[in-house]
Amino acid sequence: MRKISYDSAEKFMNAEPFKRDNTEVVVLLNVTVLKLFGNEIAYRYNDLERTLSITNCGWETNTTKDRLNAIEGVSINQSKKVWHLNGNAWDGKLIDINK
């Protein structure tokens, strides 16, 4: 895992602003957003459950996978061109992650 992925995930989970190269964490009133090349790939809502939602925004790249894998509770791997999220086939569309 690249250092930028680790650093951005740490800031994302702690709701702290971050910007380096192509990766940014934006903290809003109700949600913290992780962006990669301007695409919003993860959301952490400021609700009681601290809901975490992710998407690959249609970009099945190693960089997208690396940024998402750095987030606690997210494990993405690829087999025969199919992405698997926490052990289940995943189409990359927005999904809530259960803790």
Where are the regions that the model predicts?
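Terminal leader/tail segments of proteins
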Residues: 1-99
